[in-house]
Amino acid sequence: MLRLGASVGVHQGSRILFSDFADGGQMWTGNGPREYRLDVTFPEPFTRTPAVTVGLSMWDMDHKTNSRMDIGAENITPQGFQIVFKTWGDTRIARVRADWLAIGSVRDDEDWEIE
């Protein structure tokens, strides 16, 4: 975790969501609404729910069909979140990689708890 001052931290990562061309998966062979979800767990939890942003860093698709996609973060907690990728219609997607960034409050080294 990168710490930005005493109580703000950042986690970031990059994940291949799927490679459906290789195995004939639904994003490549399907039609209509399709969705893929990937659980991401932070290496160290935040103290409160962080702000999370997700973007595409690689998108390999069929040039013969329309390009349609929606990507975002859902079910965000201090421990992690889900990357959600959606497409619809005749879109055929071979592979997708997503990059993400989470920023939020973290414990300070000088914080202490009374039990």
UniProtKB/Swiss-Prot annotation:
User: Recorded GO terms, molecular function?
Assistant: N-acetylgalactosamine binding; oligosaccharide binding; polysaccharide binding
Signal peptide per UniProt: none
Do you know which SUPFAM superfamilies this protein is assigned to? Agglutinin HPA-like (SSF141086)
Q: What organism is the protein native to?
A: Fuscovulum blasticum (Rhodobacter blasticus)
Per the record, its GO cellular-component terms are: cell surface; phagocytic vesicle; protein complex involved in cell adhesion
- Full protein name: ATP synthase subunits region ORF 7
What's an example Gene Ontology biological process for this entry?
cell-cell adhesion
Query: Per its UniProt record, what Pfam families does this chain match?
Result: H_lectin
User: InterPro entries per the record?
Assistant: Galactose-binding_lectin (IPR052487), H-type_lectin_dom_sf (IPR037221), H-type_lectin_domain (IPR019019)
Superkingdom assignment: Bacteria
